[in-house]
Amino acid sequence: MSNVDPFLLYGTRETEAKPTHLKAGLLSLDLNDGNLRTITYDGVEVLRAVSYLVRDRDWGTYNPQIHDLNVEQSDSGFIVTYQARCEGPDATKLTIDVCIQAKSGGTLTFDAVANTATGFETNRCGFCILHPIVGVAGSPVRVEHVDGTLDRTQLPYLIEPWQPFKDMRAITHEAMPGVTAECRMEGDTFEMEDQRNWSDASYKTYVRPLALPWPYQIEASKPQHQRIVLNISDTRKAALQAGMNAEPVSITLGNTSGKLPNIGIIITPEEAKASLAAIDLLQEIDPQDLLFQYDPMAGHNGSAFADFATLAAKHSARVSLEIALPCEKSLIEETTAIASDMKAAGFNPDAVIVSPAIDRQSTPPGSEWPTCPPLEDVYAAARAAFPNARLGGGMLSYFTELNRKCVPGELVDFVTHCTNPIVHAADDLSVMQTLEALPFITRSVRAVYGDKPYRIGPSTIPMRQNPYGSRTMENPNGKRIAMANRDPRHNGKFAESFALAYAISVLNAGLDSLTLSALTGPFGLTAGEGEPTLAGGKRPLFTTIKTLSGLAGKDWWQLISSRPDHVLAFATEHEFWLVNITSQPQTVSIAQFAKITLDPYAVQNLKRS
């Protein structure tokens, strides 16, 4: 167990509730806040999660109060019962009565009945099932539909922008040779989305098709009954009985290599003056890219460019400008007006990334696309207004939006997007598991855009903009909240670990540039009041950003981890770089180092012999 102060790791003294581990024969799982995580059979993950979730009109997830929780574990299995209670706007209330049980034969059921005396508004209410992606992506599945028909197909390997399967009643996959897992969903119609779009490490099967209207009302005094049944079929002659957690994590040299990307820093008009005041810190990091943001619909105007020009003059780096184009007047009128303000301020970026502001809002399946000028016209106007700058295209939001609305890559000089790890879940495990999805994201981008120069960022733990609702979530008390515009873990060692692991996870993409932080503010590298680092000091994330900036352009070599869910690594010419992405110490074996111990969320470099 770790004795490290949680405040240093997470930026908050609030710790996550320890899950209750339950077993039924070879089936085991964690019960956490009334939902199920890490459902394994004979040590192999079968399902990542089964949860009963209630979403508000902005797709925020309610955190229900759990009452009358009763857990009974026996030699033959377990049974869990409780009541969950949600309180919505205007004194509306919803209760969910739950019974979860499993027997040693390999069957798990999760039964839930929702009821409301007041009526209750929701975007979605019911079960969500997560299948893992590593070792499962691209594998065969059998899908049973609500009309009884069967499809023998496969899970998508490249990320599917729309639902791969609809009108679902059950899905069956092979968990390991000789073991199949059928997940049966009763009580409503289910469909699957490829959650890798949002960098979630899962395929998500959820209740109620997105093509139906939302939000909708759950009517008073009309109970809604849903049930999930997991059936394991094991035809093997013997169990694995593998002690995969007992051995040290083994790190071995792989056979791929490349060049480390440039590192960028994002600077907004709101943080420009603070960034100027922290110019010494910027020069210490010495990033290769400065990425400036300009959004007229957020109140930005030409006055921002004077600060941008001063910053650009004080630090020798490539300069790029994100423009969220309102598209409310003629495109050429808007772009030339921005170009005129830039010229007046003496701000001459090397590249501009122009995207219609409306494209930052998601268009979910079944929804009507908003009015937007053709991207060909947007890019033509940008070329005319900024003839001496490289033109970037893509999305100022996330990969999801780029995957659903591919840009004409032949018209731009590079493609770009961001990611965010707290779109759907904000617990520590889910955030770190998003790293598994990153290689799938970059492969999917490369499949469309080939060897086009490719940039990612800004990608940070806190969310800078919410494409899926009307706002990002305020987080004044420093909790772990999905879609929050501040996250306490950004201030602790967790973010230092996450950022290096992020960079490792996208090495194979051959990125031109990677931006993982701002310089100041809630997305930045300087500490505020009440953080693990004294106010004005350097957050732990600073160390990773400075390290990556110092390594930019250098050769890297692949290192293969026997437990990539615990430790990730890469090599440079003279060093091994290791990162522990868990809350527990990890023992590692690598090259001449027989056994070394990495503290929770620790980053360590070792000299190669």
Curated annotation (Swiss-Prot):
It catalyses: D-apionolactone + H2O = D-apionate + H(+). Its EC number is 3.1.1.115. Signal peptide: none annotated. GO terms for molecular function: hydrolase activity. Pathway: Carbohydrate metabolism. Involved in catabolism of D-apiose. Hydrolyzes D-apionolactone to D-apionate. This is D-apionate lactonase. The gene is apnL.
